[in-house]
Amino acid sequence: METLRFKGNLTALSPIHHGGSEDYGTTKLILTLPTIIVNPLNGEEEIDNVPAIHGNAIRGYLRRLIMDDFLTLLDYELDSKKVYHFLFTGGILEALDPKDKGAINLTLKKKIRELIPPISLVGSALGNQMVQGKLKVGMADIVCAETKHYLTDYDDYNFSAYNLKGSDFGTRLDDLKEERDDDEQAHQMKYEFETLIRGTKFTHEFILEDCNDVEKSCFRRMFELWKERPYLGGKSSTGYGKVKLDYPEINSLSDDDYLKYVDENKELICNFLDELVKIWK
C-alpha cells in the first residue's frame, strides 16, 4: 500500500462564487458548513457556519480538464451520451437487462483502469460497473480567525470569515423588442450573489492511493492543466474564481510517463473506446 499526500494552498486572485444549496430572495448564497470554531472575541468554542469549497467542485473541474485533454491527445471524436457521462460527469449505474444481478465484470474494470488512466484516478460508473477512483480531493478550507486553531501555519491570521465575504450583482434584461410595444420599457431583473473576496486563502490536500507510475504521471498532467486554467467555482467566464495554486510537492512528479503511454497505446485505447460506444450507445 502506498499513500501520497500533496498539501497546498489556494489564494483567490479574483472573487470566488461557490454557491451553496440555499438562496435568500434573489441572492445566491455561498456554501457554508457547520463548524466548531473558536470565538475570536471571548476564546470560547461554538458552532458557526463557515465558508468552504467542496472537494467535489475541484474534482469535477479537474475531471473535465483531464478527460477533454485525453480525447484531444487521442484525436478521438466521442459518439455516445452514456460514454460521455462516464468520462466527464461520473456516469450512471444501471442494469443492462432484467436478468442482470449486479455481477461485476472484473475483466472490463481492469481494462478501464489500464486503458483510461484518468478514470482510474477520478472513478466513474458505466452500466452496472463502478470504478473507484484512486484520487481523493479534499475540501478547500478557508483560512480565517475562526478556523486558525485547525491550521498550524496560520497562527497569526486574524481576518474573520465574515470579513472575507463579499457580494456582487448582475442584471438580466429582456431586449426582445418584437414582444412589447414601442413605448413599453424592457423588463430588467437584478440578481445578487455572495462571493469570497480577492486575497482569501485556503488550505487543501490531494491524496493518491496505490497508483502506478502512469496514474501518478496522469495526476501531474491534470494539475498542469489546472495551472493553465486556474479557476474555481462559478462565473469564471466573467472573471470570477481565478486562483493562485501553490502545491510544491507535486513538482516531484512528471507527466512524461502518461503522455508517452497515451501516445504509444493510442490505437489500442481508441479501439477500446469504440467497444464501449457500441455497447453503451
Segments and roles (model prediction):
Residues 1-281:
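RNA-binding basic/glycine-rich loop and surface signature characteristic of RAMP-family CRISPR effectors
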